[in-house]
Amino acid sequence: METKSGIGDEKLFVEDNSSIHMVKSLHQQFRSQLQIFIYYVKTRTPPVYCYPIATILSFLLISKTQILEDVPAAFGIGIASYLLGLATYVYNDLTDIDVDHINRKEQSIVTQNQSRRGLIIIVIFLFGLAATISYIISFSAFLISIIFIILGIFYSHPKFSLKSKFPLKTIVTATGAGLLSLLGGVAAIGNGSDYDTLHNTTIFPLSTIYLAFSFSIFYFIQSPMGDFADIKGDRIAGRNTFPLVLGINRTLAVMLSVPFIILTMNGMCYNLVHISIHGTVAIVITCLLVVGFIGWISNRLDDPLLIKSKRNNVRYLNILMQMALLIALL
């Protein structure tokens, strides 16, 4: 009897140790997931923050005076936009380790130290949470979120790798940015905000489309700047980017065309969407700032670190342009 009791106690001891080991293992996995999530929040918020701002500005364009009533929806769709952008960056880094090892060594080391499965879990969680929030706000917002997720997967997945195809890399990036801007307007409409149906499509107000297009076209400045900064790694990886395909001068011409396209759109849509004179002045001033910035950076293309550090300036200018357009369209 004592022997049987001893064996039973030993089994219980082994089971207890196994349970403790399992709990410790789960705790370690959770800490690892949390650490990499915090790392990406810290390092990827700078390129991502402009997405929720554009989303909220688009929401504000539709809701106007109802914004105080719509604060929860505006906040929610802004969070969804941020999560969508963050998840896309995490997934892109996951599929881009080799190139990042050349262009961004610190980032590559952090990514390589994480298990592929762990990073995929984070991506699925972020995409899933963003889609859920969008669905709660409106079904139309949910559909745009799903389209964005599909586009993000096609952009980075090795089977499709749209980021390696010129000029699809920039076109897809710009389209994704436009979708996140449009997400705000669609969420406001789905949340019950009214808008004037005059000069609008049956689905979206023209002003929202105008705002989204203006936000997206800025990525024909921002993306080539990233290409200039990462030209060494892209050349080794065999990627076709603006400076590698068009050359430096033609790439700069593409970048300079953006403010002139926005000015042309402003003239064409002045009466159609009732653009205000104050907004027009703000748009012109912002376009002049953009031209001046491109002219300044064109003389410093031999310094990749400087170019990389100035990419945030383009984001500031893009947000400034969105605010100028909001003033013009309200």
Give the residues covered by each predicted segment.
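Multi-pass alpha-helical membrane architecture of UbiA-family
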Residues: E2-L330
